[in-house]
């Protein structure tokens, strides 16, 4: 509405503007070119077009044909001004007629309005129509399914008393293991509902009865902001909610669409598929975190025990070995703290991963429990991408349990003997002088007269059989066993290409083929093919040695449950077994076969000279 200049006198005049009243009926040009009486239900201001638009209900027609129109499509009549005639000499009647409620009225242009969108439309007979419009709106709302927001079709009532279209509630519950009312979220034991025939009849009558359209109470974002049509579709390509007009627009050309309820089912299932492995990952992470905490606790206990052992050994060396003691303690501290830091950092990482997984699961479950299809599908793809990113992060970080141990052989070994190697002039440790037991030797083994060395012979010796003798494995035991205390002995292996060195329990099997491992009472290491070292665990473990040892040292701590093997040339640790010993332990040796003459040298116990 504007002020225009007068054509003749240049002064500003007033222009009468025809007013469209809400609740009034006008002839209206329909989109198909026909003309039909239309009742104006509501008004809006179209910012893009810069004009007011009116929601027209075509009297007597289905409400689905209602549409927004501008003033140009309404046939408006201009009422005569006071005192004017119709072109004859008739006098103006003395009686002023009261304008009909459905007769368009005029209004004068007053001051320019600051904002077009704030322009007010006069509503006549508002008080007269308010009651009927409100009642009609409430009635229509009671007959509307809360899921599809349409009149009920084949309505059913669930246990809590809420009603839904049968197809809507079936889609909402599809693929779920537990059920809840989409409206109030009350848990429902069985997937059962009751047909509501009364509501079905009312909905049918409402669909067939022309009802004065009223503005529905809609939830936020229930209508398309661009076309003001109900959002019924979900665009899979753009990840947006769309109306039917959006679907047919160029913007969405060749895009794939799903009905909203179908989209909810698809993406709820996709979220469920993400949550399941995340929950499994959470359980694994929680278990690993618990085990890591136990490892840290045991690690701290071991550090304390090793420190006590080291201190007690070094006290025997007095001030001559103080410098070496401090050096070794520093080594223990550095290695222990490094290992502890690694494990603690790993625990922190696991806990952070655990918290992130819990948060993602919580958000995903909260999203899945959202019964509002509109809010559920808002940015659902971005939310799923975020969940998948968390899933990939769990897989890529690969939560693993760190189970690194302190070097038991270095910190809890024969400390005094190691020190003796460095300080021969200060201390002389006790090296146990071992001898071989001829009653246990395999018939192909030849023992020296002093019972200190053994070699393999091609010819079998004629020896009496007894329970102690090995019948198939080429082994021999030492004559001295240990059932308490700490002991250390050495065997010279020289340049042999194959050998076995270890400890055997007193009751271990000696007959037939024997699998050498701790389960069968054997704790040993061996060499094969000149460079293949193994610890005979179950299963066996390959060992990587920095140098080829010519002498092997064996340390036994019976009460401590420890058997450690060393390169006796420089006292570097090779391997440590841990076990609980319940019977006497004996050294055992095997010089193995000749290997075409490459392995003919004997094995020899080392004695102090």
UniProtKB/Swiss-Prot annotation:
GO annotations of cellular component type = cytoplasm; nucleus
Region described as Disordered: spans on this chain: 74-129
Annotated Zn(2+) binding lies at: 224, 227, 246, 252
Pfam (any one):
PRY
Q: Does the keyword tRNA processing apply?
A: no
| Phosphothreonine PTM positions | 103
Top-level taxon of origin: Eukaryota
The keyword Transcription appears for this protein: yes
The protein's PTM annotation reads: Threonine (predominantly) and serine residues are phosphorylated during oocyte maturation, when CDK1 is active.
Which cysteine residues pair off into disulfide bonds?
A: none
State which tissues express it: At the neurula stage, high expression in dorsal embryo region including neural folds and somites. Also high expression in adult brain (CNS) and low expression in oocytes.
Q: Where are the zinc fingers (RING-type)?
A: 145-185
Q: Which residues form a coiled coil?
A: 278-371
Q: Name one GO biological process term.
A: innate immune response
Indicate the principal place this protein occupies in or around the cell.
nucleus
Q: Report the stretches of sequence that form zinc fingers (B box-type).
A: 219-260
Stored PANTHER family = E3 UBIQUITIN-PROTEIN LIGASE TRIM
On subunit structure and binding partners, the annotation says: Monomer.
This one is known as Nuclear factor 7, brain
Look up and give the organism this protein is from. Xenopus laevis (African clawed frog)
């Amino acid at each position: 509405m504007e002020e225009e200049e007068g054509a003749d006198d240049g002064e500003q005049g007033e222009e009468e503007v025809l007013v469209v009243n809400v609740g009034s009926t006008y002839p209206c040009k329909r989109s198909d070119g026909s003309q039909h009486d239309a009742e104006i239900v509501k008004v809006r201001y179209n910012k893009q077009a810069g004009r007011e638009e009116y929601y027209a209900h075509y009297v007597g027609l289905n409400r689905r044909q209602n549409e927004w129109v501008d003033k140009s499509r309404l046939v408006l009549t201009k009422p005569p001004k006071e005192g004017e005639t119709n072109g004859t000499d008739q006098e103006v009647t003395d009686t002023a007629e009261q304008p009909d409620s459905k007769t368009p009225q005029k209004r004068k242009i007053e001051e320019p309005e600051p904002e077009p969108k704030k322009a007010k439309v006069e509503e006549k007979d508002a008080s007269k129509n308010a009651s009927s419009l409100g009642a009609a709106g409430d009635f229509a709302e009671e007959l509307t399914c809360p899921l599809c927001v349409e009149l009920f079709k084949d309505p059913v009532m669930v246990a809590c008393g809420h009603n839904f279209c049968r197809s809507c509630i079936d889609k909402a519950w599809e693929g779920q293991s537990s059920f809840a009312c989409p409206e109030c979220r009350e848990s429902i034991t069985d997937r059962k509902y009751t047909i509501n025939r009364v509501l079905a009849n009312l909905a049918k009558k409402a669909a067939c009865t022309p009802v004065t359209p009223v503005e529905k109470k809609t939830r936020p974002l229930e209508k398309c902001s661009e076309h003001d049509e109900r959002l019924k579709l979900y665009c899979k390509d753009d990840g947006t909610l769309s109306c039917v007009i959006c679907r047919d627009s160029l913007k969405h050309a060749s895009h794939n669409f799903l009905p909203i309820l179908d989209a909810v089912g698809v993406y709820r299932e996709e979220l469920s598929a993400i949550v399941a492995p995340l929950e499994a990952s959470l359980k694994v992470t929680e278990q690993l975190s618990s085990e890591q905490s136990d490892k840290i606790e045991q690690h701290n206990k071991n550090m304390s025990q090793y420190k006590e052992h080291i201190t007690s050994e070094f006290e025997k060396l007095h001030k001559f070995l103080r410098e070496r003691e401090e050096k070794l303690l520093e080594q223990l501290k550095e290695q222990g703290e490094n290992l502890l830091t690694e494990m603690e950092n790993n625990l922190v990482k696991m806990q952070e991963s655990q918290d992130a997984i819990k948060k993602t699961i919580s958000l995903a479950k909260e999203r899945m429990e959202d019964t509002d299809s509109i809010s559920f599908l808002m940015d659902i793809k971005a939310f799923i991408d975020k969940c998948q990113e968390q899933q990939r992060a769990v897989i890529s970080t690969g939560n693993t349990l760190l189970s690194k141990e302190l070097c038991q052989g270095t910190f809890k070994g024969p400390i005094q003997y190691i020190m003796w190697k460095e300080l021969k002039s200060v201390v002389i440790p006790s090296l146990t002088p071992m001898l071989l037991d001829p009653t246990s030797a395999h018939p192909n083994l030849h023992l020296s007269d002093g019972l200190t060395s053994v070699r393999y012979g091609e010819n079998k010796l004629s020896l009496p059989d007894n329970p102690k003798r090995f019948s198939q494995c080429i082994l021999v035991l030492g004559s001295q066993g240990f059932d308490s205390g700490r002991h250390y002995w050495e065997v010279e292996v020289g340049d042999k290409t194959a050998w076995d060195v270890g400890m055997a329990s007193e009751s271990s099997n000696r007959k037939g083929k024997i699998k050498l491992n701790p389960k069968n009472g054997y704790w040993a290491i061996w060499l094969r093919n000149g460079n293949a070292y193994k610890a005979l665990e179950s299963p066996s473990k390959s060992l990587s040695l920095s140098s080829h040892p010519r002498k092997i040292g064996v340390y036994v701590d019976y009460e401590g449950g420890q058997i450690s093997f060393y390169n006796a040339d420089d006292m570097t640790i090779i391997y440590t077994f841990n076990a609980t010993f319940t019977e006497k332990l004996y050294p055992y040796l095997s010089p193995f076969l000749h290997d075409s003459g490459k392995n003919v040298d004997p094995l020899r116990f080392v004695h102090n000279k």
